[in-house]
Curated annotation (Swiss-Prot):
Its cofactor is [4Fe-4S] cluster. This is Ribosomal protein uS12 methylthiotransferase RimO. It comes from Microcystis aeruginosa (strain NIES-843 / IAM M-2473). [4Fe-4S] cluster 2 binds at residues 154, 158, 161. [4Fe-4S] cluster 1 binds at residues 14, 50, 79. GO terms for biological process: tRNA modification. Residues 5-116 form the MTTase N-terminal domain. Its EC number is 2.8.4.4. It is an enzyme of class 2 (transferase). It is found in: Cytoplasm. Keywords: 4Fe-4S, Cytoplasm, Iron, Iron-sulfur, Metal-binding, S-adenosyl-L-methionine, Transferase. Binds 2 [4Fe-4S] clusters. One cluster is coordinated with 3 cysteines and an exchangeable S-adenosyl-L-methionine. GO terms for molecular function: 4 iron, 4 sulfur cluster binding; aspartic acid methylthiotransferase activity; metal ion binding; protein methylthiotransferase activity. Belongs to the methylthiotransferase family. RimO subfamily.
């Protein structure tokens, strides 16, 4: 057999997609394929696409078109491949393979088939696969950080979301499998482990007959990783048992990412959120009472069909009242195939944009005040980057999650991937500044 082709991966989308990319890289490297970051040098480029909202699809399409114009052989994977498999094969002659969200583990066999001249479509109609600790993985995050998927898919059917159609129903890994992978990552020097799934608080429901996040967190408390962070916690799943496990497990950070999406009962019912119209106030107060140092991040959607100025004002007051640490705001994106696609009373884009701006302006002074409260304190910071020109270090404190929250800019010397103590000397709306002590 001759030399194997060089392969690059262009990763788009969420951290769940990132893990799929990392497994494909790991499988290809294990099979002896040269893997390169430089798409220009690669014989094949795998584009792991996102199809969550229109803007994400547009980014995926731009990437595909650029590669096609450069005459690259393209393997399209991810949510867009699952969503538009036939259209992509028709529109992009450069696409030599389409790989579904439940089929990335077959990537070596797919490349082998493509090499014989076959045009491959490997897309399971109903994805059921979930990778475990035995599937090779090549991490693409900074040295100190790793994402760990505890479950794949979703059993909820929120009106605005197409993800269950693209990634299938929920399937959880066993506690033993997750802990085994966490130990592997600890042995690689990982300092921060971020637990992800579509709904992390529902972890284990399909496997054990009841959610087992509390038990999982306590088991991960035995693993030698200083920071364990939970993403995508639904408020309904933050039971006293889960809150207690967060409070009592020293390496589980008191950081909760709560995708609330709205506050008004009418809009929550329209969205078909799992807690329907039950307002979130009580749950948030319970978290703050049980974990006084809890860091709360949330996301909201403005402009859902039927959202009136009264509904939006309710959301503004909700944000003022609860003073979240971090808030992300999206404008509604009508997705074909979802229940919300053709709902009456659409909100004009200009009004959506204006509401997003107003909500962000409401949150910014809250975020800035919370950041400024850290001035003079000494906090642990995970160092992730160094500016080669200035020598300035860039990292995150425990209250900042990667990609979505702020950064800590640090003067002093430290090893990348290490957690060091930093005295905070300044703060702005999103970031902190300090010096190593």
């Amino acid at each position: 057999m001759g030399n194997k082709p060089t392969i690059a991966i262009s990763h788009l989308g969420c951290e769940k997609n990132r893990i799929d990319s990392e497994h494909m890289l790991g499988l290809l490297a294990k099979a002896g394929y040269p893997v390169d970051n430089d798409e220009e040098l690669a014989d094949y480029v795998i584009v792991n696409t996102c199809s969550f909202i229109q803007a994400a699809r547009e980014e995926s399409v731009r990437t595909l078109v650029e590669l096609a114009e450069a005459n690259k052989k393209i393997i399209i994977s991810g949510c867009m491949a699952q969503h538009f498999q036939d259209e992509l094969l028709t529109e992009l002659p450069e696409a030599v393979a389409i790989v579904g969200t439940g089929d990335y583990q077959k990537i070596v066999e797919i490349v082998e088939r493509v090499e014989t001249g076959e045009r491959v479509k490997e897309v399971s109609a109903d994805p059921t696969f979930i990778a475990d600790e035995n599937l090779p993985r090549y991490r693409t995050t900074s040295e100190g950080v790793a994402y760990l998927r505890v479950a794949e898919g979703c059993d909820y059917r929120c009106a605005f979301c197409i993800i269950p159609q693209l990634r299938g129903d929920q399937r959880s890994r066993s506690i033993e499998s997750i802990v085994a992978e966490a130990r592997q990552l600890a042995s690689q020097g990982v300092q921060e482990l971020i637990l992800i799934s579509q709904i992390t608080t529902n972890y284990g429901l399909d496997l054990y007959g009841e959610p087992k996040l509390a038990e999982l967190l306590r088991a991960l408390g035995e693993v030698d990783i200083p920071w364990i962070r939970v993403h995508y916690a639904y408020p309904t799943g933050l039971t006293p048992k889960v809150i207690e496990a967060i409070r009592e497990t020293p390496n589980v950070l008191p950081y909760l990412d709560l995708p609330l999406q709205h506050s008004h009962p009418d809009i929550l019912r329209g969205m078909n959120r799992p807690w329907q119209g039950r307002v979130n106030d009580g749950i948030i107060e319970r978290i703050k009472q049980a974990i006084p140092n809890a860091v709360l991040r949330t996301t909201f959607i403005v402009g859902f069909p039927g959202e009136t100025e009264e509904h939006f004002s309710h959301l503004l007051e909700f944000v003022k009242r609860h003073e979240f640490d971090h808030v992300g705001v999206f404008t509604f994106s009508a997705e074909e195939g979802t229940a919300a696609f053709d709902l009456p009373d659409p909100v004009p884009q200009a009004i959506m944009d204006e509401r997003r701006e107003r909500l962000m302006l409401t949150q910014q002074p809250i975020s800035e005040r919370k950041n400024q409260a850290y001035i003079g304190q000494t906090v642990d910071v995970l160092i992730e980057q160094e500016n080669p020109e200035t020598g300035e270090l860039i990292g995150r404190s425990a209250r900042f999650s990667p990609e979505v929250d702020g950064l800590v800019y640090v003067t002093g010397e430290a090893i990348l991937g290490a957690i060091v103590q930093v005295r905070i000397t300044a703060a702005d709306t999103y970031d902190l500044y300090g010096e190593i002590v």
